[in-house]
């Protein structure tokens, strides 16, 4: 294994371990706060915690066993590194992450009486489920057209979330608006990145494949391929294009998932008087 790839993998493993520790501390903190949370509030935060677990542990697994899906490339010669395992874990984790945002938006919408927010909260997970199916299509067939649709849906979902938060803005208390503004700014930046860089990249790859007459796999052929074939590579040149997004995805995105468990906008059920009986 080249030195660069080793230290990158070591970084991913260390971050994955720290993320599990952070989630465990978060779970303990929520348990200690149960006495000052109303039943509805505690149930909502506990569900956030469970959904976060799906994302945190899923990303930790993928940190230890990184896989480059389209190229069927991995670091270790093990069936655990097969694309079908890695993509299955990723699908579950990403649905959990989407559900966290949907749950958060649902709670904010209930607290502020926003119908727009409630509708958006209901459609977010189904939209991401469709995006995951498009991802599977691309991974199995090796056609980048599925990734074009997948990334477009992710961007659309983020855009709907930002729109809903902006709609809710006038109804939120002044103390929560800085956090709301930060989420909106991050969401707008994400949408811009997806539509200006990510989606065009996959679109250009698909056009190049079409121009070269690339032969795509069928769904059945793809299933057999991702189940039984993986290519072990420790070369920096092979992994260099995956390092940046994987490093951010398995660190910053996971921290955000853990933070959502204790988001201040969910605190409408907190009491400062006597503990709940």
Located regions from the model:
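Internal transmembrane alpha-helix with an interfacial aromatic "cap," most often the third helix
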Residues: 23-33, 63-70, 87-121, 129-139, ...
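Hydrophobic transmembrane alpha-helical segments in integral membrane proteins
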Residues: 1-22
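C-terminal transmembrane-bundle signature of multipass membrane proteins
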Residues: 16-26, 162-277
